[in-house]
């Protein structure tokens, strides 16, 4: 009997290590502005390799508004922007009497702007460590906590250094090793904005990111967790071509004195005017071509973008390729190259989804699905109990999982 305590302790240690090693790993990678059709238009052998080995969706439908911050946070939380509250890259909150801006460090790191529970918070609350390299929301205590390891956004941080960070995190000892790592790259979005989606420069950017994808695939092969690693590759939205001749000057159709405009380009809010004038402005703008105009109560249900108090009185959505000017400082020349923020039903706004690893089927192509389903997917793979207050549903994409994970 004297040997029992020692044996029992040994059993607990072995069982604990087995439990940790038995839990899968997930690497979630985002390539900003990677339009789904880029995989067909341009030479992408490494993305193709990932698709052939695992799963590829025809496209992934972003949430509206088709902007970077709302969609990255929807991927993280499984919620539409209307529910998590990050309704745009820049917006005013009347309750806070403050404006959220993606370049405002104090706002980005302030948890009060973020609703919902990000996947890293779900994991951390259940004792599963996570790490983030530049994912939207991870620099704040959104949902009540942060990843065990996270990096403050640095646009100039080299791509290879980002990969080095991921590799180093997965090489940590089991007790401190994250089971979920999130990684963000700002290309090919930057090239798409400047040069447009159908340009030589964007083609080069896509091919450069394909090389980055190849480097990731090659580097993870040497990781101790490789056989348990599931790689999920996404983007937040696509990109549409724009030019200065396809512009909408609101001043040509109505008098907006007394109104505040929030956002230009594909999408714009108007608010703050007198109530009786609001309906006149609405009626006036309904006559404008190349634009859809909605009172807040009339915003289509399919957009899931009408109930949050941060949504303003009037929503204007330009038709694909058209740009809404700033009515106080109209400057058509700035609207050239590419942009996003349009209706999320448009193929040009659709994102990519590819995945490979033991959790996924091999060589499987499936139809388009919404990005809010990523959260429950990752929760399932990591054996987590998901937040129930979400819009996504694992059943919507369970067909991509290997039989032992369904």
Predicted feature residues:
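Loop/turn elements at helix/coil->beta-strand transitions in domains of secreted/extracellular proteins
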Residues: 22-27, 53-57, 125-131, 175-181, ...
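His/Asp/Glu-rich, glycine-adjacent segments
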Residues: 79-196
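Metal-dependent active-site segment of extracytoplasmic phospho-/sulfohydrolases and closely related
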Residues: 28, 46, 208-249
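Short, structured active-site-proximal loop/turn typified by the sulfatase FGly-forming signature C/S-X-P-X-R
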Residues: 40-84
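A long, amphipathic alpha-helix that forms part
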Residues: 159-171, 188-229, 378
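Bacterial Sec-dependent N-terminal signal peptides
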Residues: 1-24
């Amino acid at each position: 009997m004297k040997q029992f305590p020692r044996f029992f302790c040994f059993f607990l240690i072995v069982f604990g290590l087995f439990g940790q090693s038995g839990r899968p790993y997930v690497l979630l990678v985002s390539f900003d502005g990677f339009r789904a059709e880029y995989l067909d238009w341009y030479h992408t052998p490494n993305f193709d390799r990932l698709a052939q080995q695992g799963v590829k969706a025809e496209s992934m439908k972003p949430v509206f508004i088709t902007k970077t911050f709302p969609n990255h946070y929807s991927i993280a939380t499984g919620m539409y922007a209307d529910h998590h509250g990050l309704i745009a890259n820049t917006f005013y909150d009347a309750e806070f009497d403050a404006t959220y801006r993606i370049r405002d460090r104090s706002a980005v790191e302030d948890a009060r702007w973020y609703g919902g529970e990000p996947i890293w918070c779900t994991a951390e609350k259940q004792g599963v460590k996570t790490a983030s390299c530049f994912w939207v929301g991870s620099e704040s205590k959104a949902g009540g906590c942060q990843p065990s390891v996270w990096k403050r956004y640095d646009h100039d941080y080299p791509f290879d250094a980002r990969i080095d960070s991921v590799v180093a995190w997965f090489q940590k000892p089991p007790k401190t090793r994250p089971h979920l790592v999130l990684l963000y790259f700002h290309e090919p979005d930057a090239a798409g904005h400047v040069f447009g989606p159908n340009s030589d420069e964007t083609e080069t950017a896509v091919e450069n990111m394909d090389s980055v994808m190849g480097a990731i695939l090659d580097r993870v092969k040497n990781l101790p967790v490789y056989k348990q690693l599931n790689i999920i590759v996404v983007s937040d939205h696509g990109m549409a071509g724009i030019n200065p001749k396809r512009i909408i000057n609101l001043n040509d159709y109505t008098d907006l004195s007394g109104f505040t405009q929030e956002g230009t380009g594909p999408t714009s809010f108007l608010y703050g005017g007198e109530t009786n004038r609001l309906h006149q402005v609405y009626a006036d703008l309904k006559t404008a071509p190349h634009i859809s105009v909605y009172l807040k109560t009339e915003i289509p249900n399919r957009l899931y973008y009408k109930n949050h108090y941060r949504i303003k009185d009037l929503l204007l959505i330009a038709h694909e390729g058209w740009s809404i000017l700033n009515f106080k400082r109209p400057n058509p020349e700035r609207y050239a190259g590419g942009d996003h923020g349009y209706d999320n039903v448009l193929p040009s706004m659709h994102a990519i989804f590819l995945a490979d690893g033991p959790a996924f089927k091999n060589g499987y192509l499936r139809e388009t699905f919404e990005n809010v389903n990523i959260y429950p997917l990752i929760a399932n793979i990591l054996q987590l109990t998901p937040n129930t207050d979400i819009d996504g549903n694992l059943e919507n994409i369970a067909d991509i999982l290997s039989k032992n994970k369904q």
